[in-house]
């Protein structure tokens, strides 16, 4: 320290040299366009001497005037700013910058930037080309920098050399600590657009009590009855009528909902997102206009009526010339509108499930196959006792055990008895009974009329599943304590019995669609990841190796979740309008969260818990599947193992002992906050890792990355391919099963297709739902996929870079294996009767509606 003090006092006497650098930045923009007026005012400020300055911070030379922290260099400024032409289209611009440097200053470890212009800009990076005795120093920034008067403290960026807290150069430690203090905020005040503060709140902003009782919604989180993961705090004032509810912003300002500035969509993604929405709105409105002149404006009269949503449209020119022209257009929105992938304008794209055959979706084989390779392949479980038993409290709900009997399924088990089939791991169940029964009575007071379902299936010798029976249950009319009334349906393909069987499968699909959207998709990926995003930014410095590991897997998550709270999962939002639980949807997801267990989100643990795999140390991934041809599980285990190998290599480079884990104060604070605040309603659960060993860190990070990337991809990007044709996965049922002797039963006999369509999702709901899932199923053009990074220089450490390259190569190998499996005719579940190859866990993709690709994060 004495040497540093002396150096700081005498350093100015040494000859100064120049170090040149390159700054890459993007000016303020509106979608695809640069804000030209803002650019002009910035040039005026520049001419008046109000510039953008950079000061390097030494990691070896202290400054007595600055509390012996790292010494600052003289300010340097963007070169030729006034002479650089402002591009019309939003994009990156590189500027030179030259710093004074002397030998005592040594290696810069950080820099301070001050923006004296009037507008913000996006700072991508600063690269110092040749620091004497050191070489290139790279700073990955990727942050919006607002005018300095917007900040209470300096904006600081660190070089790409990771450090554990105890290894941080002493002169940089205070800067590291202060930056985290800034990001945490003080928990007060309304957040503004330029804020960078990450904080927590409960879901108290879904309702709007100021607009009447029908818009009141239960607060999710902070109670034993309705526990929930926390969301990002906005600090908006409370509503007038309920001080515990947060007020909402007007719908027209939805895109302005607060998230920390660097969590907002980039301009390319925002352009794509709005373009997809625009196209879907047009596709939604036109059929509605046609319906005004239809005798049954809110009904599809036939399956041909439904198919007209997809066929036709305005086809754009094809070929290399037109593609070259559109690729040359600098504006992303126009490029997306003129896509040349075969989609027509003004019509929905044909969903994959009906591309090859318009009727194969109705087969029992396809109905069962989608439980293994569809959009919700995470529910099916092995049947371990017959008949199935309920776990609901009998004091509250009476006898909820299944009424399926041996007579319903015997004779369909390829010569096996029920006990033999169970012991041979041949019987499986899709069980939505216990999840729905507590809410079903209330749900059926709305326009929804549906059941809680159990579906039994038999694993055949060819690897495919055969439905055996469907049980549909309603709460007992005399009260919950009396249990349920149930009816069991068995397969038939003839006459009215065949039509009833098709309806029974539709009720199962309605159940599965709602559980998928609320639980498998929203709760188990979007909602549970957000606390990890917040805690990582609050407790792990950008210098921390684990921050660098996890950061790509949090991209855009807070923004898409905030938009969901604003327009999708709110009272009267799109989700309530299109899924069967209606206004009870989010409350129901909170009850399900009571049973959420973080370690069980690991794919091997999930498969074992559902009984579709058993632990087996001799198997490649530590588990052996009991359904060999289970596309989601087979591909998923390959992806899981690749992620775990990568995380193991990475974490092992930084942590070699339990002691290093325990003494890492940032890591311990991060994990404590995840447990006690972010997922605070489950803080006392015994299954949380103690974070005392490198293996606990590896397991936890692997699970976080799996949830954010592959699990989300598996349950999201198949939405349009499988549910874009609503008869295959209806989201609502409006009528109960027709009973003999009723007009509905007679219609079912005379016109079964029309009776089917009058039972499931109505025309308006169908169009709204299809419009939504088309948007959610598309990849934006700036997507970053598993095994990719936004910057190749995300870390300076060579061993992690080499491990990451191995990870990418492994994913490429997995892609080849997936293609080989899809081409294997013996694996019938890979494509099924609809001839739809399973590609949802294929790591990479192009932009658009592709049905493949694993983005790094929950980004849509």
UniProtKB/Swiss-Prot annotation:
Region: Disordered, residue numbers: 209-246
CC cofactor note: Binds 1 Fe cation per subunit. Iron is tightly bound.
Keyword Metal-binding: yes
Record keywords: Cytoplasm, Dioxygenase, Fatty acid biosynthesis, Fatty acid metabolism, Iron, Lipid biosynthesis, Lipid metabolism, Metal-binding, Oxidoreductase, Oxylipin biosynthesis
InterPro entries hit by this protein: LipOase, LipOase_C, LipOase_C_sf, LipOase_CS, LipOase_Fe_BS, LipOase_plant, Lipoxy_PLAT/LH2, Lipoxygenase_dom_3
Record: residues binding Fe cation: 521, 526, 712, 716, 860
EC number assigned by the record: 1.13.11.58
Any Gene Ontology biological process: oxylipin biosynthetic process
Name the UniProt record assigns to this protein: Linoleate 9S-lipoxygenase A
Species, as recorded: Solanum lycopersicum (Tomato)
Gene name in the database record: LOX1.1
């Amino acid at each position: 320290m004495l040497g540093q003090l002396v150096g700081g006092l005498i350093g100015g006497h040494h000859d100064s040299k120049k170090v040149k650098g390159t700054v890459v930045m993007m000016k303020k923009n509106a979608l695809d366009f640069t804000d030209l007026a803002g650019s002009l005012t910035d040039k005026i400020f520049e001419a008046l001497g109000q510039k953008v300055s950079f000061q390097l911070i030494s990691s070896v030379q202290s400054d007595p005037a600055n509390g012996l922290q790292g010494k600052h260099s003289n300010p340097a400024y963007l070169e030729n700013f006034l002479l650089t032409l402002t591009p019309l289209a939003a994009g990156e611009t590189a500027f030179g910058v030259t710093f004074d440097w002397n030998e005592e200053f040594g290696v810069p470890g950080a820099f301070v930037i001050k923006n004296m212009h009037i507008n913000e800009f996006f700072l991508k990076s600063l690269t110092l080309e040749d620091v004497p005795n050191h070489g290139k120093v790279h700073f990955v920034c990727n942050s919006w920098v607002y005018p300095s008067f917007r900040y209470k403290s300096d904006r600081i960026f660190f070089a790409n050399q990771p450090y554990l807290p105890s290894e941080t150069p002493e002169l940089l430690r205070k800067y590291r600590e202060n930056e985290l203090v800034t990001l945490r905020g003080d928990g007060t005040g309304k957040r503004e657009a330029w804020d960078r503060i990450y904080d927590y709140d409960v879901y108290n902003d879904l309702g709007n009590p100021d607009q009447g009782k029908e818009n009141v919604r239960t607060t999710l989180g902070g109670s034993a009855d309705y526990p929930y993961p926390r969301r990002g705090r906005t600090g908006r004032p409370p509503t007038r009528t309920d001080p515990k509810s947060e007020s909402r912003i007007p719908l027209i300002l939805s895109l302005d909902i607060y998230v920390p500035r660097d969590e907002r969509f980039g301009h390319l993604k925002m352009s794509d997102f709005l373009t997809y929405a625009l196209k879907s709105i047009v596709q939604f409105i036109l059929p509605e206009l046609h319906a005004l002149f239809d005798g049954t404006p809110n009904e599809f009269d036939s399956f041909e009526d439904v198919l007209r949503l997809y066929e036709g449209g305005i086809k754009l020119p094809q070929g290399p010339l037109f593609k070259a022209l559109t690729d040359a257009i600098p504006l992303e929105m126009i490029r997306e509108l003129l896509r040349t992938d075969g989609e027509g304008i003004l019509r929905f794209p044909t969903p994959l499930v009906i591309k090859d055959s318009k009727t194969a979706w109705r087969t029992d084989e396809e109905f069962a196959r989608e439980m293994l390779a569809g959009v919700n392949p995470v529910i099916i479980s092995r049947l371990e006792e017959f008949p199935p038993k309920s776990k609901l409290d009998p004091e509250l709900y009476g006898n909820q055990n299944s009424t399926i009997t041996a007579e319903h399924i015997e004779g369909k088990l390829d010569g096996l008895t029920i006990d033999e089939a169970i012991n041979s791991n041949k019987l499986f169940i899709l069980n939505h009974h216990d999840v729905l029964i507590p809410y079903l009575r209330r749900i059926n007071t709305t326009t929804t009329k549906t059941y809680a379902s159990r579906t039994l299936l038999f694993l055949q010798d060819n690897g495919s599943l055969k439905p055996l029976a469907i049980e549909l249950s309603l709460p007992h009319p005399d009260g919950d304590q009396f249990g349920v009334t149930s009816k069991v349906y068995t397969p038939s393909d003839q006459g009215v019995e065949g039509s009833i069987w098709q309806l029974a499968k539709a009720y199962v699909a309605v159940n599965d669609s709602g559980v998928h959207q609320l639980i498998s998709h929203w709760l188990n990926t979007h909602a549970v990841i957000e606390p990890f995003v917040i805690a990582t930014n609050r407790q792990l410095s950008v210098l921390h190796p684990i921050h660098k590991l996890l950061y790509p897997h949090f991209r855009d998550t807070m923004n898409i979740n905030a938009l969901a709270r604003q327009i999708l999962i709110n009272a009267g939002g799109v989700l309530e309008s299109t899924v069967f639980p209606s206004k009870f949807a989010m409350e129901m997801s909170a009850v399900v969260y009571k049973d959420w267990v973080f370690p069980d989100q690991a794919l091997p643990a999930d498969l074992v818990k559902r009984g579709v795999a058993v632990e087996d140390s001799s198997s490649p991934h530590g588990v052996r599947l009991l359904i060999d041809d289970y596309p989601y599980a087979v591909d998923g285990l390959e992806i899981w193992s690749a992620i775990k190998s990568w995380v193991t290599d990475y974490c092992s480079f930084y942590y070699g002992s339990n002691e290093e884990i325990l003494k890492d104060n940032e890591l311990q604070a991060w994990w404590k906050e995840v447990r006690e605040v972010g997922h605070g309603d489950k803080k006392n659960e015994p299954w949380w890792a103690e974070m005392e060993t490198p293996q606990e860190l590896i397991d936890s990070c692997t699970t976080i990355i799996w949830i954010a990337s592959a699990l989300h991809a598996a349950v999201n990007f198949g939405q349009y391919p499988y549910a874009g044709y609503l008869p295959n996965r209806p989201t609502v049922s409006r009528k109960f099963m027709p009973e003999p002797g009723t007009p509905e039963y007679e219609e079912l006999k005379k016109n079964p297709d029309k009776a089917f369509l009058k039972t499931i999702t109505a025309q308006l709901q169908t169009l709204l739902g299809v419009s939504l899932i088309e948007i959610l199923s598309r990849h934006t053009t700036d997507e970053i996929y598993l095994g990719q990074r936004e910057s190749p220089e995300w870390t300076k450490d060579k061993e992690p870079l080499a491990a990451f390259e191995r990870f990418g190569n492994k994913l490429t190998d997995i892609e080849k294996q997936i293609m080989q499996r899809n081409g294997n005719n013996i694996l019938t579940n890979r494509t099924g009767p609809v001839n739809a190859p399973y590609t949802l866990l294929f790591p990479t993709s192009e932009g658009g509606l592709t049905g493949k690709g694993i983005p790094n994060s929950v980004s849509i």
